[in-house]
UniProtKB/Swiss-Prot annotation:
Belongs to the TRAP transporter large permease family. This is Ectoine TRAP transporter large permease protein TeaC. It holds the Pfam family DctM. The complex comprises the extracytoplasmic solute receptor protein TeaA, and the two transmembrane proteins TeaB and TeaC.
Length: 427
């Protein structure tokens, strides 16, 4: 049964069908092979509905909507200008500012695609003008945007939390340390790159310009305060924090900044609705697929066949990293989380691994795979936005992928990088 389901998925993917079709088809085939007919079909429908029933999923369209509003408004530019005012003048400062701006906007929006658009669109031309190569600029924007997978809010963490039953609030807090560690790695590389290539520095901003930039960015900086402060302080659940972010974004862009008009609402709602529909369909069919393979005890059979259960906690973590990394090079990250998390669930439980640490590692691997050739989804986002050839986009990615893999190794060796803030906040 496993072979037929996997072959069906691969075959339909190669034929160019959207990911939801192979998942749904494989689920139906597996269901028929287990139950032998339509008699229990209502069970499959129930599993489809169960996938999108959790109230926590409401946070997904909320964060998507907030990100769309901010991308179309002034929040992103104000954050970029503030970062540039303080570190733009150092060696490699423009590149470091790009990485920091991606991280900061990721902490505001939770969306890698929104971050690529909001930060990459204004900063890539400035980087090219300053003397950075296009391949380096594109790779930096893509990989820095993927830090949004780790810095809360993170849609990937929400999906993992629902599938695994892990606290989304704990995942959000635990992602901060690894996200900042990766930002530091990228910043060091940017400085070294600028020194080696002889990239000139930007003019230094005066303290008056810095204070002005901070003043203008104070309102957008309220987003991470609402999310992290609200969850940490027990004021909001993650879902309530998402709703508060939407309200805050509407007030900022429509009332305070007046950067958007009533006529923009239709385009924003349409964009949010389309993205949300795709995510929810994937979650629904992914849940039915996960239920079928779990019911058939396929995960246990796979893990026993490859001997992962005897590998110990470190071996299980390495296997998880490799599986998620490779899968995300070819398949949408949400689908990978939905399909592979149940596969490794028995091994995670058997070895007593902290599900929060596992969630952070999975999220990191999703980030790496999404920016890795041949089919990482963020590569094609950059191709669509910047209108550059495929080879130009991927040429500068290897150093960043190496740093992300190094970050994963450090997390396995030193789990407190992720768990320290979690323990401080919740234990």
């Amino acid at each position: 049964m496993t072979t037929i389901m996997v072959a069906t998925m691969i075959g339909l993917l190669l034929l160019g069908f959207p990911m939801m079709i192979p998942l749904a088809t494989a689920s139906i085939i597996g269901f028929f092979m287990m139950f032998g007919g339509l008699g229990q079909m209502e069970t499959l429908i129930q599993q489809l509905m169960a996938g999108i029933r959790p109230a926590s999923l409401i946070a997904v369209p909320m964060f998507i909507l907030a990100a769309d509003i901010m991308t179309r408004g002034q929040s992103a530019n104000r954050l970029i200008n503030m970062v540039m005012a303080f570190i733009g003048h150092i060696k490699g400062g423009l590149a470091v500012s790009t990485a920091a701006s991606c991280t900061l906007f990721g902490a505001v929006s939770g969306s890698t695609q929104a971050t690529v658009v909001a930060v990459g669109s204004p900063l890539r031309p400035r980087m090219l003008k300053a003397g950075y190569s296009d391949s380096f600029s594109l790779a930096l924007i893509i990989n820095s945007s993927d830090i949004a997978f780790l810095i809360p809010p993170s849609i990937g963490m929400i999906i993992y939390g629902i599938i695994s039953g892990t606290s989304i609030g704990e995942l959000f807090i635990a992602g901060i340390g690894p996200g900042l560690m990766i930002l530091v790695m990228f910043a060091i590389y940017c400085v070294i790159y600028a020194i080696v290539r002889g990239v000139p520095t930007e003019p230094k901003a005066s303290w008056g310009e810095r204070f002005s930039a901070v003043r203008l960015a104070l309102w957008p900086l309220g987003f991470p305060v609402i999310i992290i402060g609200g969850i940490y302080g027990g004021i909001f659940s993650p879902t309530e924090a998402a709703a508060a972010c939407v309200l805050y974004a509407v007030l900022l862009e429509f009332v305070v900044f007046r950067s958007l008009k009533i006529s923009d609402i239709y385009a924003i709602a349409k964009s949010t609705g389309l993205i949300t529909a795709v995510v929810f369909i994937l979650v629904a069919v992914g849940n039915s697929f996960s239920w079928i393979i779990s019911f058939a005890q396929i995960p246990q059979a796979i893990l026993e066949a490859v001997g992962i259960n005897e590998a110990g906690p470190t071996g299980v973590l390495i296997a998880i990293c490799v599986a998620f990394f490779v899968a995300c090079m070819f398949v949408d990250p949400i689908v990978v989380i939905l399909v592979l998390t149940p596969v490794f669930a028995p091994a995670i439980e058997a070895t007593g691994l902290d599900p929060v640490l596992v969630g952070i590692l999975i999220t990191l691997q999703v980030a790496i795979g999404s920016a890795t050739p041949p089919f990482g989804c963020d590569i094609f986002t950059a191709i669509a936005i910047f209108k550059r050839p495929y080879l130009d986009v991927i040429k500068g990615t290897p150093p960043f992928i190496f740093m992300l893999v190094l970050a994963a190794a450090l997390l396995i060796l030193f789990p407190q990088i992720a768990l320290f803030l979690r323990d401080l906040a919740f234990r």
